[in-house]
Amino acid sequence: QNYRNYFDKQTGFMRGKLSATEWRTPFSPFVSRHMKDDFTEGNAWQYTWLVPQDVEGLIALQGGDQPFTQKLDSLFIAKGDMGSEASPDISGLIGQYAHGNEPSHHIAYLYAYAGQPWKTAEKVRYIMDNFYTTKPDGIIGNEDVGQMSAWYVLSAVGIYEVNPANGTFVFGSPAINEAIVRLPKGKQFHIVVKNNSAKHIYIGAISLNGKPYTHDFIRYSDIMSGGSLTIYMTDKPGNFGTLPADRPHSVF
């Protein structure tokens, strides 16, 4: 939880320090100086969210669910000059969100932790539709050991690991209608998506192995056990996954 020491409550951003009590100045959440600044290939707008190990703590640090989601909303529309020394890897921009660089990849899924999974669905589907093609230059940024493609594969199936260390996948907005995950010892995990379309981007309900499932996440252990997951899509945001007990958690 050392990240808390770098959160400036006055500006609402993570920022660099000269000492335990002194912030580095001048400061702009937009500016990025490649290899010369406190952020690598990014700025404070992008790196403030890089706390996958304690999303609940980050939400509390920002004042709760509503201020947290309002800040996320602002991220996707904020406009500002990153400066002439910004890395070219900061690409695929939606406001200050940079899908072309991996530190941003989990951000669209953070809405689910604060009870607004429909915004995760909207952002994830937009990114898949607009930042990936089948052309030779079909990815929006640096592939970096396959992460740009891995984000798409997981998101297209409808899940994503915000915290890879805690064994859970957050639901998003599946782009395909069926997937089979082949597992050891002849097992398989079968994902079927019903009523999916360009307009039906929101998850309305889910069943796991034929039983109603209300959580907005699925555990790795459930997938590895084999079975079936059916996702029912709708064209309007609903209440699926919004209750505190059904939201994903970064710490279990």
Segments from the language model and where they lie:
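Active-site core of glycosidic bond-cleaving carbohydrate-active enzymes
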Residues: Q1-A175, A179-H190, S221, S228
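Short strand-turn-strand beta-turns centered on an Asx-Gly dipeptide
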Residues: P184, S207-K211
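Short aromatic-glycine motifs in intrinsically disordered, low-complexity regions
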Residues: F189-A198
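Short proline/glycine-enriched turn/loop segments at secondary-structure junctions
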Residues: K194-N195, I218-D222
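Beta-strand-rich binding/interaction modules
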Residues: I201-A205
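Solvent-exposed beta-strand/loop surfaces of large extracellular or lumenal domains
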Residues: G210-R219
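C-terminal beta-strand-rich structural cap/linker in extracellular carbohydrate-active enzymes
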Residues: Y220-F252
